[in-house]
């Protein structure tokens, strides 16, 4: 079991960490900020006169744009 843990940590260290350093733009994306830049608001439910385009932070909230 210890050797499996060792190889898992080694695999993580060799593959995931260098990829995160090499491509930081693919790391974490702040969807709430992106929604605000697009003149949207993060809400639990969009009104009838709004368009839902994406999720904000968690799947329960939506980015709502006015038509």
Swiss-Prot record:
GO biological process terms on file: cell chemotaxis; defense response to bacterium; innate immune response
Compartments, record wording: Secreted
Keyword presence, Signal: yes
Disulfide-bond pairs as recorded: 35-63, 42-56, 46-64
GO-annotated molecular function: CCR6 chemokine receptor binding; chemoattractant activity
Signal peptide: 1-19
Primary site of residence: secreted
Keyword Repeat annotated: no
A family per Pfam: Defensin_beta_2
PANTHER family assigned: BETA-DEFENSIN (PTHR20515), BETA-DEFENSIN 110 (PTHR20515:SF19)
Described function: Has antibacterial activity.
Family: Belongs to the beta-defensin family.
Protein name, UniProt field: Beta-defensin 110
Organism: Homo sapiens
């Amino acid at each position: 079991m210890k050797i499996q843990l060792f190889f898992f940590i080694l695999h993580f260290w060799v593959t995931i960490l260098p990829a995160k350093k090499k491509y930081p733009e693919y790391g974490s994306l702040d969807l709430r900020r992106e929604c605000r830049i697009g003149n949207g608001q993060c809400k639990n439910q969009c009104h009838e006169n709004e368009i839902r385009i994406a999720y904000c932070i968690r799947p329960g909230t939506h980015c709502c744009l006015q038509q």
